[in-house]
Amino acid sequence: MHLPGRAYPMEDTDPGNWESAVVSPETVIEKIKPGMSIFLGTAVAEPRTMVRHLMTSDAKNLEDLELIQLVSFGDAVSLQSLQSRNFRLKTFFSGWVASAAIEEGRVDLIPSRFAKIPQLIESLLRPVDVAIVQVTPPSEDGFCSLGIAVDVAHEALEHAAICVGEINTQIPRTFGDTMVHVSEFDFLVRSKDPLIYFERWETDDVWDQVAQHVASLIEDESCLAFSIGPLYEALAKSLANKRHLGIHSPFFTDPLMDLMKCGAASNRRKETYRGKALTSYAFGTWRLMKWLDSNPMVEFQRIDKVFNPLVIGRNPKFVTIVAARRVDLYGRIGLHTGKGIVAAGPAEVMDFITGAELSEGGRSIFALTSRDRAGRANILLSVAAHPNQFAGFESVGAVVTEYGVAYLEGRSVRERAQALIDIAHPDDRAGLVRKAKDKKILYGDQIFLEESARLYPADLAATLATKGDFEIRLRAIRPSDEEGMRHLFYRFSDEAVYSRYFHSVSSMPHAKMQEYVNVDWNQVMAIVGLVGEEGKGR
């Protein structure tokens, strides 16, 4: 896109002779004036050669500069360099090392829904004077590819007075809205920096169990949003036998590549960008980058499309899976913070949660292990002290640990608390019950059999198929089944009540029903059958 009234120094450059137009980073730095706002390519597409020269240059004109970057990994833009008064980093992202820097006042966080960021640049609420992005060498037709991070690069290039393309031969050439003609750059700089790679996360038996429970909630033909971490590594393995999954994800990763390569994700049942995986960023190993190179099955688009809840919601059965750090008995979520976390901010999560709510058959799933690596409980009475909270706890559809699934949608606070206690670590449940009773979240007379919690026969779970493909899910009863069992009681006929309880019973309040759902597994066996959609059946 050529802006009216702007000169394009490279407009007449022969694409086949682009190397003759390459300048040194110092030449670019000379054009920067004090007080300018400089947009830097995001995350693994950070233009590290130019950034490194900016950070180390002693040029007198580099004063009071504002650096704008959606996601900063603190690689070239280090926290040490930001201690200088010459630079101030402003980011829309609260993950990775930015979380600590924001708390220390060294980085400014701009709270915003990701889908709205392009509008902030286009409306000049966040003006950009200089745009520096990393691109592939131009093709014979003169088009460079933005590679593995599209985000708002186009908007920044369209509104900047100075556009710099840092050409790196190691970037995969990707498809979608990734192309920028070489003539749109004012300067080209050569980079020999390697890409930033992420090794695959290690998983263990606990994460595998969490993933299996998450996978049980994902139907064939669902459309998925992933991030990075052990949850997603384990989940891809558990989804390998699904059919016609779709991908509409902020980040494309090695596990998503695995799902496409094994045939589980065909993208043929999606409503938007059918036949292709949709994303805006890629994070992963060199194998992923090699696979993405010139791969037409993965579509990279701007974040106002990838993060747009209305676009997301057009896909039926859209499922967003979020790795949680903590959860409390109200269903409030504490998200991850710190280095190693890419999708950490509530704003990034909320766009996809909203999209799932708009999707027919969509759902949001928050998953975590019941305890962290240090053995501390991840299910707490309250996460009020956690620094990175997801405020929309009413939008939390389900929480998953290795001990099962807590369905929260449509449930009261008391019912939520009971369901979450059921999936907490068995050694943490008695304490949670006691604290919840003290806070009047649970009934004061709530029964809890501590030893029974450790004996719960999870291996009895099975699915019974009847005529007409009608399925009944069987499992051992849980304390959180109390409300469902109470409603079932009032649907019984008098004869059914008598045959079940061997005498006439006219009512089944909490005090009575809790005795039937809190089972001593040393002496009693109680099985429930569930029909209908997971979490919404009866």
Describe the function of each predicted region:
Residues 2-450, 485:
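Conserved alpha/beta enzyme-core scaffold
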